[in-house]
Amino acid sequence: MSEIELEPGADPERAERARKLFSGPIAFLKSAPALQHLPVPSVPEIAFAGRSNVGKSSLLNALTNRNGLARTSVTPGRTQELNYFDVGEPPVFRLVDMPGYGFAKAPKDVVRKWRFLINDYLRGRQVLKRTLVLIDSRHGIKDVDRDVLEMLDTAAVSYRLVLTKADKIKASALADVHAATEAEARKHPAAHPEVIATSSEKGMGIAELRTAVLEAVEL
């Protein structure tokens, strides 16, 4: 088996560039609790969004091959900041860890602040090339996810759906949720038509996701 498992039609040169970039320098840049704290928009950005407990921190750690890059909050919904990570030295692009959504126990004012921060970020960030919206394979797309997809559609931000925890369900169930998620993607004008299934624990889909990130930032 080759070191990098490629999807059909994938560009092997881009896949190798992705492997090297994500194996190289990656560093935390800053946390931005409000728009005025965002870094200078000097390089392309890829944002990661998802419900609380969707496995976003684990996926970011697997993607960057680092155990402690993204830390999991003890209390879902507590962190209301955009966390920036530089990829490359000097930075070639940035990963943006968006605060989780769909937190049942969060106060209403926290939810409102989240919507304002994310909505303003999505609408005004020209260097944002794509948002990766993470969906738990075990649960599929929920109404709160659809709300975020509509927010992205309205802001005309290109996004792609990524299934997480794909190793936690049977192959037949994964095939069903993958098909249902792609069917949902086709309903949304700003969504990429293809869905990537991943497992942070098993490494499934990680090479494909790295390549998709490079494709989105046009490297």
From Swiss-Prot:
GO process terms (BP): division septum assembly
Record-annotated residues binding Mg(2+)?
A: S57, T79
Where does this protein come from, organism-wise? Sphingopyxis alaskensis (strain DSM 13593 / LMG 18877 / RB2256)
Alphabetized GO MF terms: GTP binding; metal ion binding
Entry's SUPFAM superfamilies? Answer: P-loop containing nucleoside triphosphate hydrolases
Identify the PROSITE patterns for this entry: G_ENGB
Signal sequence bounds: none
- Note the HAMAP family from the entry: GTPase_EngB
What family name appears in the similarity comment?
Belongs to the TRAFAC class TrmE-Era-EngA-EngB-Septin-like GTPase superfamily. EngB GTPase family.
The cofactors required by this protein are: Mg(2+)
**Which residue range or ranges hold the EngB-type G domain?**
42-219
The answer to whether the entry has keyword Magnesium is yes
Which UniProt keyword terms apply here? Cell cycle, Cell division, GTP-binding, Magnesium, Metal-binding, Nucleotide-binding, Septation
Spell out the Gene3D superfamilies in the cross-references. Answer: P-loop containing nucleotide triphosphate hydrolases
Q: What does this protein do?
A: Necessary for normal cell division and for the maintenance of normal septation.
GO CC, one annotated term = cytosol
Protein name per Swiss-Prot or TrEMBL: Probable GTP-binding protein EngB
Q: Which InterPro entries match?
A: G_ENGB_dom (IPR030393), GTP-bd (IPR006073), GTP-bd_ribosome_bio_YsxC (IPR019987), P-loop_NTPase (IPR027417)
Q: Which residues bind GTP?
A: 50-57, 77-81, 97-100, 164-167, 198-200
Q: Does the keyword Metal-binding apply?
A: yes
